[in-house]
Amino acid sequence: MLDPNLLRNEPDAVAEKLARRGYKLDVDTLRAHEERRKVLQVETENLQAERNSRSKSIGQAKARGEDIEPLRQEVNALGERLDAAKAELDALLTCINDFSMAIPNIPADVVPLGKDDSENQEISRWGEPRQFDFTVRDHVELGEMAAGLDFAAAVKLTGSRFIVMKGQIALMHRALSQFMLDLHTEQHGYQETYVPYLVNHASLYGTGQLPKFGEDLFHTRPLDEEASSSNYALIPTSEVPLTNLVRDEILEEETLPLKMTAHTPCFRSEAGAYGRDTRGLIRMHQFDKVEMVHITRPEDSMDALEELVGHAEKVLQLLNLPYRKVLLCTGDMGFGAQKTYDLEVWLPAQDTYREISSCSNMGDFQARRMKARCRPRGESKTRLVHTLNGSGLAVGRTLVAVLENYQQADGRIEVPEVLRPYMKGLHFIG
């Protein structure tokens, strides 16, 4: 959520910055709402003052023995007008809030201008794609040869875009998540955190999934049903519960940064992905991810983003998986992001790089929604924190990359050296 003062005082400047990401801010509606708010605010305050004055007059008239009925009727009429003005103001404030909640974040000045992913900026590459002297198999064929990926069973149990993993493939999937968690907690300074997989609507508003992206979530009740204590959604990423741990909190600045990581399943309806990546593990309704979240002082967040993406890169480097780092253009960034890097891993069967991690600085966009603040030592005044999040990594896509990059001519998979301690010392599977 953008700063309301910025929207009120500099709407044209905000509109110009948002236009860089292809968003047209309705400045006329914004101004009309603000003008009406000012009128109602003054009207409400005047009616309240007049009602208080008239109420005081009733006591004075009564003490003098005068007939107070005319004054009482006048006070009642003022009360009705005040209630009506308050109701209209409350409705308008709700409308303004809904309007503001739908506005995306302002891109950082360094973000390249562009319409879509074709205009993203490649920053660097690491590793050389392996040259195979045999016909490359994709991860689906390799997983089925190893009797470890069973898509048919998942369809029987649930439906499409789900998977049943078995045996050594399931072991490798678990090993990857354990390796990532150990790396982040032992070398990168994160606190491992276990979080709920169901969250309430307040959490989803806090990190920006609601109200705009409700159809992308799996809800325990219809989204249009009135919110209640039991109206939950499955998490689309553990960014949601991890970041919301600081909702409504005031943190002492000397405790920052906070660095948290969690391994969770993630659940997404993929409402806009019909027909895309229908084969294999690339785009699933349920997938595992190791998430990294930073809570920082405002002045530290851009440096923290570089650190965050470096931690995700380290996972790929230790697995010896070729990848490239991409700076997203304005038109390809997520709704709440100021600046985003994607890491794309090389998939031999697709002969291309595919996203495996997205790392974003959200600035104070989420913090304003969550009322997450920090306070400098010895001061009473608070300020909003900055929040960052990144995949470290998507476990299923990492499994895909390992299967395809480490495949042998006979269909077996060499186990990356760093995973062997997590896989009973196995050097090959399949």
Curated annotation (Swiss-Prot):
GO biological process: selenocysteine biosynthetic process; seryl-tRNA aminoacylation
Main location: cytoplasm
UniProt-annotated stretches for the region Disordered: 45-65
TM regions (residue ranges): none
Catalysed reaction, written as an equation: tRNA(Ser) + L-serine + ATP = L-seryl-tRNA(Ser) + AMP + diphosphate + H(+); tRNA(Sec) + L-serine + ATP = L-seryl-tRNA(Sec) + AMP + diphosphate + H(+)
Amino acid composition bias (Polar residues), ranges on this chain: 45-58
Keywords: Aminoacyl-tRNA synthetase, ATP-binding, Cytoplasm, Ligase, Nucleotide-binding, Protein biosynthesis
Subcellular location field: Cytoplasm
Enzyme Commission code(s) on record: 6.1.1.11
Pfam family membership, one: Seryl_tRNA_N
GO cellular component term of the entry, any: cytoplasm
Protein residues bound to L-serine: 237-239, 291, 391
Domain of life assignment: Bacteria
Enzyme class of the recorded protein, top EC level: ligase
One example GO MF annotation: serine-tRNA ligase activity
Pathway in which this enzyme or protein is active: Aminoacyl-tRNA biosynthesis; selenocysteinyl-tRNA(Sec) biosynthesis; L-seryl-tRNA(Sec) from L-serine and tRNA(Sec): step 1/1
Binding site for ATP: 268-270, 355-358
Recorded domain comment: Consists of two distinct domains, a catalytic core and a N-terminal extension that is involved in tRNA binding.
Quaternary organization: Homodimer. The tRNA molecule binds across the dimer.
Primary role: Catalyzes the attachment of serine to tRNA(Ser). Is also able to aminoacylate tRNA(Sec) with serine, to form the misacylated tRNA L-seryl-tRNA(Sec), which will be further converted into selenocysteinyl-tRNA(Sec).
Family: Belongs to the class-II aminoacyl-tRNA synthetase family. Type-1 seryl-tRNA synthetase subfamily.
Name assigned to this protein: Serine--tRNA ligase
Gene symbol of the encoding locus: serS
